[in-house]
Structures are given as structure tokens and as C-alpha cells.
Amino acid sequence: MYSFGQISSGELMQQLAERLKARRLEKGVSRQTLAEMSGVPAPTIARFEQQYAISMRQYIDLAIALGYAEQLQVLMREPIYKTMEELETIQNNKNRKRGR
């Protein structure tokens, strides 16, 4: 997949929070129940849904509890390139074994 668009980390965190909240509501799961399912405290879930702040570990725990384990496993498989120059550089360096 080649995508040259950019999104800020804040915008991405907001989107992730909104998607997780929507999934939680679709499944009819309360924050307290999700807390029990995931091990992430309910106040942390509330803060994430409202302020988009959470640790990576807690986000992963929530995502797995809501059925996103497979999507997380493929998250970094397909590279996304910001520019053609970056794409060309990466293609040229595919066979490199070590960094400098």
C-alpha cells in the first residue's frame, strides 16, 4: 500500500479512541465490564475515550479484549511511504543486512 498522506499523532489517537469506543458500544460492553475483560482500569478507559491518552500496552489490552487481535498482528506488515523518494530509498536498501 502506498499512501503519501500525513496524519498527526493526536489525530490518530483520536481516531483510535473513537473506533475503540464505537466497538465497545456496538458490543454493549460497559467501561467497567471492559476493564474486567482487559485488566485496564475503568478510569483509564474513560480518559482514553475522552482525552485520547493511554499507554501502548493498555491500548493493546483493550483492542484484544474487543476482538482486534488479528488486526494488531498485521499492523506493521505493509509499509506505507510518505514520498516517492522514501519508497525508492527503501527499495534500494531491501537487501542490506546491517546498519552503519
Regions found by a protein language model. Give the residues of each.
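Short basic helix-loop element that most often maps to the first helix and adjoining turn
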Residues: 18-33, 93-100
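Short, basic-rich loop-to-helix N-cap that marks the start of a DNA-contacting helix
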Residues: 51-64
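Short alpha-helical DNA-recognition segment
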Residues: 28-46
